């Protein structure tokens, strides 16, 4: 009997998760399918419980439901400490967060070392929470820069219980960029074709790495600037595929072909 998985969010029409997971199921000849479901916040609990009672294997949870998912199913330690869940497993009846691990795996697979490295994270929203958590757990020193300095300071204060984290403004950004080994963009800047990147080539050099979580477009203005400076670059599809692979493994106990998932996502864009 086929096992169904899916992603719930609002909106969810542009999700690449079905393409990635179905490609992995096909490659492994597994009798499973993955679909997307648009669910508003007021219906989230009913949708999750309904999927469970219908025999689904599990769900991914995306914007804007990641925090609410913690209140519906018992979170594991990582999801609890991050304050958000993106993966629900109905066999274990647990909520997990694979975003942090996906970001770290993307950096590692891109040849970037993290222990004792300085990292500048742009943005202090939900995506930043998972990324900063993953970084400090790997022994990096993290500076969070945000337009609203108080928000960066608040996130840094919370994450400081897990490692070395500081909050700052976007003022004098060039100096802050030059002081670190890695720059990570967790903001939506770059989704618009005319968006101007916060970090430009004159702030960077070839010893640094730049990671942009934005994946529409894959080649963001920030990554173009980084390449022009000779810096190492990692794009958002790399993280998307790896967080998806972690969810797949939680549900099935099988390590999926990450290369197949990543290629299918790139081909779908």
UniProtKB/Swiss-Prot annotation:
**Which top-level enzyme class is recorded in the Swiss-Prot or TrEMBL entry?**
oxidoreductase
Q: What is its EC number?
A: 1.1.1.25
Ranges in coiled-coil conformation: none
Q: Where is the active site?
A: 66
Instruction: Give the GO terms filed under biological process for this record.
Output: amino acid biosynthetic process; aromatic amino acid family biosynthetic process; chorismate biosynthetic process; shikimate metabolic process
Residues given in the record as NADP(+) binding sites: 123-127, 146-151, 213, 236
| InterPro entries reported for this sequence | Aminoacid_DH-like_N_sf, NAD(P)-bd_dom_sf, SDH_C, Shikimate_DH, Shikimate_DH-bd_N, Shikimate_DH_fam, Shikm_DH/Glu-tRNA_Rdtase
* SUPFAM superfamilies, alphabetized: Aminoacid dehydrogenase-like, N-terminal domain, NAD(P)-binding Rossmann-fold domains
The reactions it catalyses are:
shikimate + NADP(+) = 3-dehydroshikimate + NADPH + H(+)
| Molecular function in Gene Ontology | NADP binding; shikimate 3-dehydrogenase (NADP+) activity
**Amino acids binding shikimate:** 15-17, 62, 86, 99, 215
Family, similarity comment: Belongs to the shikimate dehydrogenase family.
Explain the purpose of this protein.
Involved in the biosynthesis of the chorismate, which leads to the biosynthesis of aromatic amino acids. Catalyzes the reversible NADPH linked reduction of 3-dehydroshikimate (DHSA) to yield shikimate (SA).
Q: What is this protein called?
A: Shikimate dehydrogenase (NADP(+))
């Amino acid at each position: 009997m086929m096992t169904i998985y899916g992603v719930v969010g609002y909106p969810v029409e542009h999700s690449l998760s079905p393409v990635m997971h179905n490609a992995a199921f096909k490659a492994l000849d597994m009798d499973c399918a993955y679909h997307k479901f648009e669910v508003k916040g007021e219906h989230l609990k009913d949708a999750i419980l309904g999927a469970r009672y219908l025999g689904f294997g599990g769900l991914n949870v995306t914007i804007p439901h990641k925090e609410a998912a913690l209140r519906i199913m018992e979170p594991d330690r990582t999801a609890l400490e991050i304050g958000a869940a993106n993966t629900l497993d109905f066999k274990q009846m647990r909520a997990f967060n694979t975003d942090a691990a996906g970001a770290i795996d993307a950096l590692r697979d891109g040849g970037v070392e993290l222990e004792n490295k300085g990292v500048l994270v742009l943005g202090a929203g939900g995506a930043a929470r998972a990324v900063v958590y993953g970084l400090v757990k790997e022994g990096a020193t993290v500076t969070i820069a945000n337009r609203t300095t108080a928000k960066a300071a608040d996130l840094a204060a919370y994450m400081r219980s897990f490692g070395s984290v500081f909050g700052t403004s976007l003022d004098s950004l060039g100096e802050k960029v030059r002081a670190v080994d890695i720059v990570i963009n967790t903001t939506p800047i770059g989704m618009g074709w005319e968006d101007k990147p916060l970090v430009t080539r004159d702030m960077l050099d070839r010893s640094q790495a730049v990671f942009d979580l934005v994946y529409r477009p894959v080649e963001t203005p920030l990554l173009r600037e980084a390449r022009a400076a000779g810096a190492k670059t990692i794009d958002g599809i790399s993280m998307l595929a790896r967080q998806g692979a972690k969810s797949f493994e939680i549900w099935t106990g099988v390590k999926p072909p990450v290369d197949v998932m990543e290629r299918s996502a790139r081909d779908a864009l």
